Design a protein with these regions (language model features):
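A short, small-residue-rich loop immediately preceding and capping a beta-strand
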Residues: 93-115
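ATP/NTP phosphate-donor binding region
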Residues: 1-99
């Protein structure tokens, strides 16, 4: 894995780059963002390809992991899907300290970031 430091006016952050690094990076993310609840937002396609992957990676991190699966596709980047995510967050008692992880591509990243 390689790391790239990005320095911008007023902020800086690190980007980790590599192949098959999620198992190494996810525990670090949880460790650097103290929480007892991780909410994963993904889509039906990713869920079929990687069932329980994040659960397995984080099983020894001592956090509760909840998974919100939404339909795949650009058509689902809308307020109805966002409302379903909000309902899910309320049902699993997510709070300000809960960590949300977008596990997927553009639509997942966009809608999770907005939520």
């Amino acid at each position: 894995m390689e790391s790239l430091n990005v320095n911008l006016p007023g902020r800086e952050y690190k980007i980790d780059i590599g192949f098959d690094i999620l198992g190494e990076c996810l525990p670090q993310v949880v460790q650097n963002n103290p929480t007892d609840h991780v909410v994963v937002v993904t889509n039906t396609t990713i869920e079929k390809l990687y069932p329980n992957y994040i659960f397995d990676v984080l099983q020894n991190s001592g956090v509760l992991v909840s998974s919100c699966v939404i339909p795949d596709g650009e058509d689902y980047k809308n307020l109805e899907t966002l409302s379903k995510i909000f309902d899910f967050l309320m049902n699993v008692c997510a709070n300000r300290e809960s960590l949300m992880i977008a596990f997927g591509g553009g639509v997942i990243g966009d809608i999770t970031g907005f939520a």
